[in-house]
A protein has these predicted regions:
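Cleavable N-terminal export/targeting peptides
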Residues: 1-26
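Gram-negative (and chloroplast) outer-membrane scaffold detector with strong preference
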Residues: 20-28, 34-42, 71-168, 194, ...
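Surface-exposed strand-loop-strand hairpins of Gram-negative outer-membrane beta-barrel proteins
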Residues: 37-73, 178-182
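Short acidic, glycine/proline-rich loop/turn micro-motifs
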Residues: 44, 165-172, 214-217
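Conserved binding-pocket/active-site segment within a compact domain
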Residues: 165-170, 180-184, 191-195
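Outer membrane beta-barrel transmembrane domains
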Residues: 184, 191-193, 200-209, 225-235
Length: 235
């Protein structure tokens, strides 16, 4: 995906206007927006019996967690180095629900004296959710295409502080927990800016999000796709 987006950006360069777009007329900018997040499945691989998040698992369990789409609210604070390069801090609040767990190899999970037994090749509905606050900092490149339209490409690193709560699985509280964590996060994004005035423009972006949230002998890291629209002001 990154290679394809890079090729698209490079191939657009011959058509880049030499005149500044409205959106690069001032150094500082702030933005506020919202969008949706589409989490990827998270693999489960519990090779040995153990306890994670206060839940005791039997060994040999494999499967995946599935999630519903959720929402994001985000803010931007940036500074333009020149006509094409900015450095930006993105603050975000994200929330989405668990959908279900798909077990490939079953086993047991015990929490609070209650044991959940999951069968192989079976799916169970989950009552639970994840909410997160994130901060990402990094460079943004933008390329003028028309007088008030430009493409952007960027990314950054930072952290995500999140609450991960499962209330029940398949109606059982045997796999229930409520944990707070803070982990390394990164984001790649691309999109476009459309200027309304010299101080105001609309930004639409696609983002690929990564959180180093994997737990040894339990789950892999978290990744997700996001689609956002922001109203941005220069000053």
């Amino acid at each position: 995906m990154k290679r394809i987006l890079s090729i698209v950006a490079i191939s657009s360069l011959p058509f880049v206007s030499q005149a500044d777009t409205y959106s690069v007329s001032d150094k500082f900018y702030v933005g506020l927006g919202a969008g949706i997040i589409s989490p990827n499945d998270v693999d489960i691989d519990i090779s040995a019996a153990g306890t994670v998040n206060g839940v005791t698992f039997s060994g040999g369990i494999t499967g995946e967690f599935e999630f519903d789409n959720g929402y994001q609210i985000n803010g931007l604070l940036g500074y333009r180095i020149n006509d094409y390069l900015s450095f930006e801090t993105e603050l975000g609040y994200t929330k989405f629900d668990y959908d279900k767990v798909n077990l490939t190899v079953g086993g047991t999970a015990t929490s609070g004296g209650v044991t959940f037994t999951g069968a192989a090749s079976t799916s169970y509905d989950i009552d639970g959710s994840i909410s997160a606050f994130s901060m990402i900092f990094g460079p943004i490149l933008d390329f003028d295409v028309y007088e008030n339209f430009e493409l952007l490409l960027g990314g950054g690193i930072g952290f995500a502080s999140y609450n991960d709560e499962i209330k029940s699985v398949g109606g059982s509280t045997g796999l229930s927990y409520d944990e707070d964590s803070t982990d390394f996060a990164a984001k790649f994004k691309t999109g476009a800016n459309y200027s309304f005035t010299e101080q105001t423009y609309l930004q639409a972006t696609y983002g690929f999000n990564y959180i180093n949230s994997g737990v040894d002998n339990f789950t892999d890291d978290f990744t997700a796709h996001s689609f956002n629209a922001n109203l941005v002001f220069n000053f």
